[in-house]
Amino acid sequence: VAILVNPYAEPEMWRELFGELLPDEDLWYWPDCSDPTAVEMVIAWRMRRSDLATFTNLTHILSMGAGTEQWQKDGSPEAMIVRLSDPNMSNEMAAYAVHWVTHFQRGFEKTFTPAGLDGWGARDTPTPPEYPVGILGLGTIGGRIGAAFQSLGHPVNGWSRRGTDALGVTSYAGDDELGDFLAASRAVVNVLPDTQSTRGLLDATRFAQFGGATFVNIGRGTVVASEDDLVAAVNAGDVGAAVLDVTSPEPPDASSPLFGHDRIVITPHIAGTTQPRSAAGLIAANVARIRAGEEPFPVVDPDAGY
């Protein structure tokens, strides 16, 4: 049996790392695949469904990223999908969220012009205890982001489908409590995955409930129902500012109203990145679990979509 590896970037580094970490495995690197029926595991960010279909003995897909919607767009494959849960990526995303929330909490955007330097000195800005941060999505990454804000003194609100018992987090659950969650937060950080239940979650009605809060999206762009809804909400002051590391489509069309807006920041999906050196070790550990007859971690629930 073989493991097929399909790196989406830095192929030589992945080859070197897996060679060291999985010396006893028969590793093939796409597109080299002499016998598709011998492929038992795939390590990749994505592959065409038509190619996956040729691996008739495939049992596991080990994703090279935290998101897994790319594997489920045309229905979940029969193979078990294992997503990447890397603390380094969680820390990167927490740092990104803290950076941008602090940027607008402290009014730093007002100092970037000569006029903004008038009245040099201290400014009257809300303190962290006066600036609750809401986290949409309370998985591993959302929990790390919440802890980062708590360490700085921010009250943290959390929204998810089922709620949370995380220490110190004010929990909101389900559609009925989403409006209250938004109204209680002065910044909203989205880390929800792309699933059928999250697509279009934030529409014009929901943006009107932000109450001037800053919106930071580092989950998936599909949570926003419409670019026009978001831009209109920013123009109306319902959303104080928006920082978008993810959009739909990605990147936005050149004519998108998101570009050139003085209260909208776009970054190119860099809030959290797969770091080969740490990710390869986590993937190799899951290969070892599979070989030992144990369940890898974390396994995607095909019904939930994550």
Language-model features and meaning:
Residues V1-V39:
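N-terminal glycine-/charge-rich "phosphate-binding" loop or analogous flexible N-terminal tail
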Residues L27-A38, R49-L52, G168-A184:
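Short acidic low-complexity segments
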Residues E40-T113:
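Phosphate/diphosphate ligand-binding glycine-rich loop within oxidoreductases
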Residues E78, P129-P132, G212:
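Phosphate-coordination loops involved in phosphoryl transfer and adenosine-cofactor binding
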Residues N88-Y96, K110-T111, E250-Y306:
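C-terminal helix-to-coil terminal segments
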Residues T111-R144:
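Glycine-rich NAD(P)-binding loop of Rossmann-like domains
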Residues S151-G168:
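NAD(P)-binding Rossmann-fold cofactor-contacting core
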Residues G163-P257:
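Rossmann-like adenosine-cofactor binding region
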